[in-house]
């Protein structure tokens, strides 16, 4: 894995505990601040408490209690310019189109390629916010 120094705070939302702990460990080793949630309701609770600190959310689609889609919409209500990377083993084209419509531009496949996850998260943290008033990153 390529070495880089991470900056920023990342919320990982993942219901598979082994995957959650692995990604958390890798991100911590890269220097990121990491928050975690293992279901949709916990994700919303953590996000509401820390939304001003969180730079990017790594969001699994298949979650218990609330789906990743529901979590995404609630996060957008809290902070319209939330930056999200969707993680999924399979995403139907219609759902991907809907997520893209609400400004999700980054998707990573599961099982994770950890280098890809780190690079994608850092590129989103580094991306400037559009000045057109849309509050979405320029990507």
Kindly give the residue locations of the regions a language model identified.
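The feature encodes the CheY-like receiver
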Residues: 20, 64, 92
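Conserved acidic carboxylate
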Residues: 14
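Short hydrophobic/Thr-rich beta-strand motif most characteristic of the beta2 strand and flanking loop
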Residues: 31-39, 46, 108
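Acidic catalytic/metal-coordinating carboxylates
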Residues: 39-42, 67-70
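Charged docking surfaces used in two-component/phosphorelay signaling
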Residues: 21-29
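Residue-level signal for the "D+5" position in two-component response regulator receiver
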Residues: 36, 63-66
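Active-site residues of response regulator receiver
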Residues: 60, 88
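Non-catalytic signal-transmission and effector/linker regions of two-component phosphorelay proteins
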Residues: 1-11, 24, 45-48, 53, ...
